[in-house]
Structure formats: C-alpha cells, structure tokens
Amino acid sequence: MAARAGIVLARFSAAALPNRCALCGNLSHRTICDCCDGAYWNEARLRCPRCALPLPGARGAMRFHCGACAKTPPPFDATLALADYRAPLDSLALDLKFRAQLALGREFGERLARLATDALDGAPPLDVIAPVPLARRRLVERGYNQAWAIARPLARKLKVRADAALAARVADTAPQSRLAFDARRANVAAAFAVARPVAGLHVGVVDDVMTSGATLDALARTLKEAGARRVTNFVALRTAKD
C-alpha cells in the first residue's frame, strides 16, 4: 500500500511540479517552453532534400538539391534536420551529448517524427531505424549513445522497429570535431560494419548533429554495399555550411 502511494505521489509530482526550460531556464511543464518553441523551432528554411543543407527560399517551395548533391549525389537518399546548428539550439545538442540530459533525446526524436510525417510523405516506408554507432571505448566512457537517445523515441512515434545494433563501429577513430573537413572522410571511411541483414530495407539513420556529412556518408555507403535499398538520415541539427 505504501509503495503504491509512493508511485501515485511520484506521478502527481511529475505532473504538477514544473521543470525548467532547457533553453531559457524558466519554469515549464515541457522540455522547451512555449516561448522558446516559437522563437527557435518551427523554422521555414528550405533545405536540400538529400543533405539538409539550407538553401535560399522557404520550406514548401519546389525541392531543389544543393550544388554538391546535384553534382555528386551522396550514398544516402534523404536527410531531415530540425534546424541549423546555431545558438542557442547548439546548447541542447551539447547537453545531450556531454551532460547526459537524455530528455533532450526524446525532444529531438519526437520533433523529428513530426517532421518526417510530412517530409517523407510518398517515400517508401521505413523498415528500421538505427543510431550512428559509437566506438566501444567511447560508449563505455560516456555511458550512452546520444544518437540512440534520439532514435528510440523517433522510432516509437513512427511505429518503426528500432535496432541499436544494426551497425557497428569497427574502428575507434579520432573525434571528427578535432579534424579539418578534408580529413574527416578519410577518418571514417572504413569505420563501420553492418551487423544485421539489411538487404532490400529502407534504413533510417539517426545522429545528433550533421556537420561535414562524412560520418553519415560512410555509414550509408556501408549499408548500401550490404544491400540496403534506401537510407534516410535523421539529424537534430545541421551546420549551415560544409
């Protein structure tokens, strides 16, 4: 009886006592308060449908590819991004990645699910969603994979199977953020292996931030070589320029 009362009290407290907005710090019942939601999310930027690079124009206009994707299409087929990697949204990615603010993974995942409902209309249905894998050493050090923290709620909302072990990181590479852009592709070129059958599948790949695109490029190439029919990237934030 006492245990049940404790559970009820905990649920009541969670519902009744406000948290703080992850951006402004004001009291809020949601991870992002309504004010910050309106100010920083729901952007209308037109993006390249292949790599999510921002383009001139507004969302809803004709779907043009950026010059790089038009000239040399990457191995992935589409990329969805919530917003640019810029202040103050960049702090959310950093808090998730380095400060174990795992509620932000759910926030990113659920927002990506809403975006996907419209953006992927008419595309082949997703068969499985998987995170960009971390090297074992880094996973042990951090204790979690921030991409998986996004992938699980995304898959749950889209009612798609999630698989944390679909791909494996077989090379413990240097952090991409420490390398010049031209060195990033070589750094991750042979970093991944496919651990489950993917032949004929539409695979959704999840990461927190897309910068040069080298990591997602390498993983998509590995998936395609293993027979994946289509690869769609889901990223919380996208740097404005490669």
Q: At which residue positions do the language-model features occur?
A:
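Glycine-rich phosphate/pyrophosphate-handling loop used in enzymes and phosphotransfer proteins
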Residues: M1-D207, T211-D242
